[in-house]
């Protein structure tokens, strides 16, 4: 009887070569999964070494703190020779903060030397960098690990090792990775021989690419996606086994048995002990040039704040505001944030000096300092602000100041930042693009070799809210067996891939600006957009590392408002009408206009800011805003937070009761609560109100209240509200004898704020823009809609819908025409001089040439310049004097923009085709050309005209597509939107229209809201879940939708509750329409 082989002693181990899914389409595990598994296996440390990247390190850091595992920051590189050919692979590990800065600069240099998504690191970049990079020679303060190829050529490995030893000296080790393949013994012998020959120690590494072997199928799919091949064609490019998964220490002990194995494993822990850098050591330094010489940041911020206060309050600063300013300045100084406020102030000051509309949003609107600096527009003297919502001692993260700028002029602001601070000190934050259901379905389906047509149909039929059960049904509808191994494998891999990083994009506007070289704090790489650079961390990473960003955001409505005001200002008599002594501005508009609020209460808000969506339009006739603060509530109440917290219906009921004279409809359990909730009729609509109650009635400090805010936001993920709720119960019920039912309801409402909700200050800022845009639509509709058209792309509605709404607002819209149009849509005096009820003449809108698909701006500018010299006499004259080529003439003819020179579309196209190559013919030949009788072509039928309009302009002024089908629809007994408006509540009805909007709010329990449009207006349709499941294809895909259902109307709220749907899209023929789906 033989004795069993004794088990080896479990070795101490640190994994020093590990990539995550931030090595895009290669790593098959999240950083947090790798950290958790390393801790489970008893590793001493884990080095995250993604390919020329530290993008995943911030998330790994959070996980390492949670699991109490040492995290080492590193990166893997392929080093190329002088010819640019791959030569060797190595890992660099940061030993300290200097080493991390050097590593970050090396990554930056390699990334900026290549297009987005790639990198290029030459041997000379490490061995003998020149100029500003000379200090990176040999990657000081970084450990280097040479990664030999599997079963390498001994001479080639020797050459690689000699070079690495010369560059990195005694900081070099040679990795021994054993993937349990056919040549492991020979591989081990070769690496050992080279190690001994040049006296460089070996170290065990795993080349980890997944935390568990069960991820091997996903790893294969990622490889196939990366190679753009189906799995069946990948062959040897797939990993031969799952040995790139993390190994237990028992597995490692067996694997590295034999000569030197124990030493090789021990070396991992020795190297880990030499790496003592944490991302927490990164110290961000603010830019200093925003502070004038001779002043400290605190002195300058105080001076500018009180100078701004004097401008904001010409009659004197109230004691309340003065005290708030002093409190804020004290806390800002304590936390050292003055340079950040001054940096944002500098950017805003530039924008205002250049006439660029801007406005701060979010919790920054709680700050009196921000208001006085002109960053935000919410007056702390008249609004309800809570500074703790914006900044507190307890918050272990920087303040968040988001500023919206006109979206068409934001580039000027961005270039100002680059020019002021330089490209080495500033870059945009990254936006991490991850796999969602449809993208995962498509990529996995292709990798599995499923027919592309089937893949596309299944992906199109799969909505974001669908479960795996619905996926199986969609696959079955395409002829696949839902229970087949292929479909089950497809579903499983999609589940795994969903949420995986795909690539880094650029954040919508978050700039990180540093005092010194930004690339020593975080690597920088090229963005897809020219002259853009992004760092490798996204906004969440920046918050976890306490790095500040300046958010330079784009808001289309600011562009539209500025353009509207400019056009109105140019109209005769308008300045006098609005009492403006200089150029018309928002401040000149009355802030309590009755007609504007009447229009809002009728939900005629297409095109205006924030209150134009289907959900907002449904709420407006119920809430019926009559003043500014009503709009603040309106903007905020249609959000998941208030809805899930059960706050909407109680508020509306109390508002209605109060409107009907019932002044006793609201009671308060105590004066502290009344002081906070009186403005919202006893219902906490805003998160700040819960914080205020906690402070005034629950004995919370400002820092305690901020912790409550954070825990409310994280309740769904962490469920950590109990301690706060218990504290409130004790303070309010036990101590102050409040009604327990009220406190219990408050605690439930706190859970509702785990869903998204607007801060009151944010809603207040947006309400201002909602009112201004509503006023302009009500009183200056021509300028407003022309500005919206010129500000595209933006907003909730398409240009076609905006033009329809302009016409419903009694604005005449004239077609694009080369004899009258310029690039933008413009205002033209009405020939009849008709005035509105306010005595103002409303001009017509002339569509601009920018509405024509394929039209190029330089050609439009040449047309305008030539027309200014003399009117065009013919298409030939136009082509010659404006130097238009065949493309220009064809798109103009297709858009019917040559009608005044050539007649209808067919005639115009014929004339353009009859010309020689425009812009290049000679005058002598033109004079000698024979005169021929023009060929008269028949005009196209109206249906063809409308289709051509939509194809070229995306809209038609001649007829609505549904109007062309009206005779047929009447035979099918479909009523128009105008007819439905007269139906009684509960009447059976049927309607047909083009689908313009589909929405499925997360708070609507699966209900979908659809808007359809016919020639007389829009119809709001409600689809209940049972109908959605029964008629899914019609719900998701129909462009022209017939609806059978029951009409519901209450005051101004009208909608059609669907009972049956019909997809009538084929009736549209080749007409292409578009809808805004599930945004």
UniProtKB/Swiss-Prot annotation:
| PANTHER family membership | DNA POLYMERASE III SUBUNIT ALPHA, ERROR-PRONE DNA POLYMERASE
**Reactions listed under catalytic activity:** DNA(n) + a 2'-deoxyribonucleoside 5'-triphosphate = DNA(n+1) + diphosphate
Q: What is its EC number?
A: 2.7.7.7
GO terms for biological process, alphabetical: DNA repair; DNA replication
Q: What is this protein called?
A: Error-prone DNA polymerase
Lineage top rank: taxon: Bacteria
Which GO CC terms are listed, alphabetically? cytoplasm
- Give UniProt keywords alphabetically: Cytoplasm, DNA damage, DNA repair, DNA replication, DNA-directed DNA polymerase, Nucleotidyltransferase, Transferase
Record localization:
Cytoplasm
Q: Note the InterPro entries from the entry.
A: DNA_pol3_alpha_NTPase_dom, DNA_pol3_finger, DnaE2, DnaE2/DnaE/PolC, DNAPol_HHH, NA-bd_OB_tRNA, PHP_dom, Pol/His_phosphatase_N
Q: Which Pfam families does the record associate with it?
A: DNA_pol3_alpha (PF07733), DNA_pol3_finger (PF17657), HHH_6 (PF14579), PHP (PF02811), tRNA_anti-codon (PF01336)
Q: Disulfide pairs?
A: none
- List the lineage, top down: Bacteria, Pseudomonadati, Pseudomonadota, Betaproteobacteria, Burkholderiales
Record flagged with keyword Cytoplasm: yes
The UniProt GO MF terms for this protein read: 3'-5' exonuclease activity; DNA-directed DNA polymerase activity; nucleic acid binding
């Amino acid at each position: 009887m033989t004795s069993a082989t004794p088990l080896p002693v479990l070795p101490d181990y640190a994994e020093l070569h590990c990539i995550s899914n931030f090595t895009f389409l290669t790593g098959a595990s999240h950083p947090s999964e790798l950290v958790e598994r390393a801790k489970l296996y008893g590793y001493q440390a884990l080095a995250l070494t993604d390919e020329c990247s530290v993008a995943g390190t911030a998330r790994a850091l959070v996980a390492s703190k949670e699991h109490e595992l040492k995290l080492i920051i590193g990166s893997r590189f392929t080093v190329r020779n002088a010819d640019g050919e791959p030569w060797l692979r190595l890992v660099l590990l940061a030993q300290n903060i200097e080493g991390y800065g050097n590593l970050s600069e090396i990554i930056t240099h390699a990334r900026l030397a290549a297009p987005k998504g790639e990198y290029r690191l030459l041997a000379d970049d490490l061995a003998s960098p020149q100029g500003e990079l000379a200090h990176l020679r040999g990657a000081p303060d970084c450990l280097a690990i040479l990664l030999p190829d599997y079963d390498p050529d001994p001479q080639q490995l020797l050459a690689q090792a000699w070079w690495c030893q010369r560059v990195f000296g005694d900081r070099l080790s040679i990795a021994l990775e054993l993937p349990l393949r056919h040549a492991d013994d020979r591989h081990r012998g070769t690496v050992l021989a080279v190690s001994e020959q040049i006296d460089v120690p070996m170290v065990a590494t795993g080349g980890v690419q997944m935390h568990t072997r069960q991820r091997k199928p996903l790893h294969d799919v990622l490889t196939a996606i990366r190679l753009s091949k189906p799995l069946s064609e990948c062959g040897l490019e797939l990993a031969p086994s799952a040995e790139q998964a993390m190994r237990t220490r028992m597995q490692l002990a067996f694997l590295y048995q034999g000569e030197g194995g124990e030493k090789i494993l021990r070396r991992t822990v020795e190297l880990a002990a030499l790496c003592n850098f944490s991302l927490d050591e990164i110290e961000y330094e603010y830019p200093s040039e925003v502070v004038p010489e001779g002043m400290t940041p605190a002195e300058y911020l105080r001076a500018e704040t009180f100078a701004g206060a004097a401008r904001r309050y010409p009659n004197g600063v109230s004691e309340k505001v003065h005290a708030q300013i002093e409190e804020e300045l004290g806390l800002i100084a304590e936390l050292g944030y003055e340079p950040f406020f001054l940096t944002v102030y500098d950017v805003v000051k530039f924008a205002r000096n250049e006439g660029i509309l801007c406005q701060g949003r979010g919790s920054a609107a709680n700050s009196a300092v921000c208001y006085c600096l002109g960053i935000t527009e919410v007056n702390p003297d008249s609004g309800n602000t809570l500074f703790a919502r914006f900044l507190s001692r307890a918050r272990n993260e920087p303040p968040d100041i988001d500023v919206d700028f006109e979206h068409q002029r934001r580039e000027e602001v961005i270039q100002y930042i680059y020019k002021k601070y330089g490209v080495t000190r500033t870059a945009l934050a990254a936006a991490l693009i991850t796999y969602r259901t449809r993208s995962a379905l498509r990529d996995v389906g292709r990798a599995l070799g499923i027919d592309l047509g089937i893949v596309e149909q299944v992906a199109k039929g799969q909505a974001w809210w669908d479960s795996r059960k619905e996926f199986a049904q969609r696959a079955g509808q395409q002829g696949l067996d839902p229970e087949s191994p292929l479909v089950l494998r497809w579903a499983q891999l999609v589940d795994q891939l969903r949420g995986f990083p795909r690539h880094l994009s650029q954040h919508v506007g978050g700039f990180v600006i540093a005092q010194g070289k930004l690339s020593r704090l975080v690597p920088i790489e090229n963005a897809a957009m020219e002259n853009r650079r992004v760092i490798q961390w996204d906004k969440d990473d920046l918050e976890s590392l306490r790095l500040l960003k300046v958010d330079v955001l784009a808001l289309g409505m600011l562009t539209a408002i500025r353009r509207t005001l400019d056009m109105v200002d140019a109209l005769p008599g308008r300045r006098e009408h609005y009492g403006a002594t200089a150029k018309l501005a928002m401040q000149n508009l009355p802030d309590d206009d009755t007609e504007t609020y009447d229009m809002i209460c009728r939900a005629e808000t297409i095109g205006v800011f924030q209150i134009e969506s289907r959900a907002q339009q449904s709420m407006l006739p119920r809430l019926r805003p009559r003043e500014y603060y009503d709009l603040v509530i309106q903007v905020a109440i249609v959000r998941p937070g208030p809805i899930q917290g059960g706050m909407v219906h109680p508020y509306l009921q109390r508002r209605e009761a109060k409107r009907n004279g019932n002044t006793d409809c609201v009671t308060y359990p105590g004066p502290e609560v009344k002081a906070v909730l009186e403005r919202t009729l006893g219902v906490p609509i805003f998160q700040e109100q819960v914080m205020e109650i906690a402070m005034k009635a629950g004995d919370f400090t400002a820092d305690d209240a901020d912790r409550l805010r954070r825990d409310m936001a994280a309740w769904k993920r962490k469920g950590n509200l109990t301690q706060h709720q218990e504290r409130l119960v004790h303070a309010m019920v036990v101590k102050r004898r409040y009604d327990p039912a009220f406190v219990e309801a408050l605690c439930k409402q706190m859970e509702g704020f785990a869903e998204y909700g607007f801060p009151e200050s944010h809603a207040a800022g947006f309400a201002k823009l909602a009112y201004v845009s509503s006023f302009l639509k009500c009183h200056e509709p021509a300028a407003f809609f022309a500005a919206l058209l010129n500000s595209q792309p933006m907003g909730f509605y398409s240009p076609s819908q905006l033009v329809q709404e302009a016409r419903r607002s009694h604005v005449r819209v004239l077609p694009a025409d080369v004899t009258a149009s310029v690039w933008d849509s413009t205002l033209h005096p009405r020939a009849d001089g008709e005035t509105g009820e306010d005595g103002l003449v409303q001009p017509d809108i002339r569509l601009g040439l920018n509405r024509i698909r394929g039209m190029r701006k330089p050609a439009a500018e040449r047309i305008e310049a030539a027309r200014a010299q003399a009117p065009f006499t013919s298409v030939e004259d136009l082509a010659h004097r404006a130097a238009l080529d065949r493309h220009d003439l064809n798109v103009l003819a297709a858009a019917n923009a040559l009608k005044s020179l050539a007649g209808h579309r067919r005639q115009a196209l014929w004339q353009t085709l009859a010309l020689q190559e425009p812009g290049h013919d000679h005058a002598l030949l033109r004079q000698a050309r024979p005169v021929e009788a023009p060929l008269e072509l028949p005009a196209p039928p109206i249906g063809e005209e409308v289709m051509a309009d939509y194809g070229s302009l995306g809209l038609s002024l001649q007829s609505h597509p549904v109007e062309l089908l009206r005779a047929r629809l009447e035979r099918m007994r479909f009523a128009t939107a105008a007819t439905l408006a007269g139906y009684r509540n509960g009447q059976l009805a049927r309607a047909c229209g083009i689908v313009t909007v589909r929405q499925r709010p997360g708070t609507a329990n699966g209900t979908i809201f659809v808007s359809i449009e016919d020639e007389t207006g829009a119809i709001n349709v409600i689809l209940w879940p049972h109908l959605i499941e029964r008629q899914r294809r019609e719900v998701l895909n129909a462009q022209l939708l017939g609806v059978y259902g029951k009409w519901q109307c209450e005051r101004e709220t009208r909608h059609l509750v669907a009972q049956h749907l019909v997809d009538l899209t084929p009736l549209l023929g080749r007409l292409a329409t578009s809808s805004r789906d599930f945004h």
